[in-house]
């Protein structure tokens, strides 16, 4: 039996797999918007990284996910935080330490987002890291899923079809997408030098 998704949940980068980017909420309207106030703020765990590993980052383009009232959000360095969406209380932080493998060579460090997956019982968050890892994280514990890949990790550096290239030229331009038993991970490669006056 298919479970009903709570109104207000935002389980994928675009809201749903249709990427409709719509939530049927009506508490905030054009008339009361000017009265809104900041309820809580969250300090990114990236700020606690050692200085030599805190690489320059690009624009923050990830979208927080909401699943049953819990917010899951990633940082540009690839850490995932679970937060109480009402209070902002930090429930757990998962750090894949992918930044230890170095930054991209021709672009700022950026992690575009995370993906929620469930089979109706098991619930996971997927992230494709800058270190070319696909990681499955248990949303209850914040720990890698030991039943996925190699203790929660899949090495995405395998079977590229090319023998020689600089691994740090490859980045992920979008969050992974998980459908059924398949996880789709896109990537892009900078195979030429990037300059301000380079053509688009």
What do the predicted segments below correspond to?
Residues 39, 89-93, 143-146, 155:
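A structural motif specific to WD40 beta-propellers
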Residues 1-43:
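Blade/loop signatures of beta-propeller domains
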Residues 42-63, 93-119, 150-175:
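Extracytoplasmic beta-rich repeat domains
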């Amino acid at each position: 039996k298919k479970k009903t998704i709570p109104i207000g949940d935002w389980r994928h980068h675009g809201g749903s797999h249709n990427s409709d980017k719509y939530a049927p909420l009506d508490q905030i309207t054009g008339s009361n918007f000017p009265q809104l106030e900041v309820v809580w703020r969250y300090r990114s765990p990236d700020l606690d990284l050692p200085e030599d590993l805190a690489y320059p980052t690009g624009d923050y383009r990830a979208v927080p996910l909401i699943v049953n009232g819990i917010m899951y959000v990633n940082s540009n360095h690839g850490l995932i935080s679970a937060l109480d969406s009402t209070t902002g209380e930090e429930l757990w932080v998962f750090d894949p330490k992918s930044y230890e493998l170095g930054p991209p060579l021709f672009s700022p460090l950026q992690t575009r987002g995370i993906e929620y997956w469930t089979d109706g019982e098991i619930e996971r968050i997927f992230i494709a890291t800058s270190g070319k890892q696909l990681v499955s994280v248990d949303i209850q514990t914040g720990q890698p899923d030991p039943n996925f890949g190699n203790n929660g990790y899949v090495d995405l550096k395998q079977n590229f079809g090319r023998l020689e290239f600089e691994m740090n030229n490859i980045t992920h331009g979008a969050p992974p997408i998980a459908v059924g038993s398949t996880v789709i991970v896109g990537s892009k490669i900078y195979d030429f030098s990037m300059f301000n006056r380079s053509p688009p």
